[in-house]
């Protein structure tokens, strides 16, 4: 789990987002967002309102890193992600500002600074990210 003030190393040169990647998103007027790529261009995404299960292209998404129910927020689906965009969510689904909210929405891949690959601060949490 990443926390506010954590310091990260990014892979950014020639980076193309992939499902499950933890990415840093430039927001220009605000602090960057650090979220996980859930769906990409061409994918169909649905969140079951009763079970809170995330369905990607009709299949339940395996998310061992999520420990809270995925609440809907402003999300109304199913949606098909347009090419050149990604849908991102935080791992703390009950308290994450992410693509489920109209305020954030879909992320243009051009706004992704890179993939977070390694945490260098705080010292007691140094290590690779999954």
Q: Where are the model-predicted features located?
A:
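Soluble "head" domains of membrane/secretory-pathway proteins
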Residues: 4-130
């Amino acid at each position: 789990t990443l926390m506010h003030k954590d310091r990260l190393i990014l892979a950014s040169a020639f980076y193309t987002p992939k499902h499950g990647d933890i990415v840093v998103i430039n927001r220009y007027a605000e602090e960057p967002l650090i979220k996980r790529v859930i769906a990409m261009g061409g994918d169909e995404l649905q969140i079951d309102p009763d079970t809170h299960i995330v369905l990607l292209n009709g299949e339940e998404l395996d998310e061992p890193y999520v420990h809270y129910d995925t609440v809907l927020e402003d999300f109304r689906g199913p949606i098909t992600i347009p090419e050149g965009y990604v849908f991102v969510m935080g791992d703390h689904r009950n308290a994450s500002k992410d693509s489920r909210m109209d305020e954030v929405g879909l992320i243009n891949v051009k706004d992704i600074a890179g993939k977070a690959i390694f945490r260098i601060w705080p010292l007691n949490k140094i290590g690779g990210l999954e």
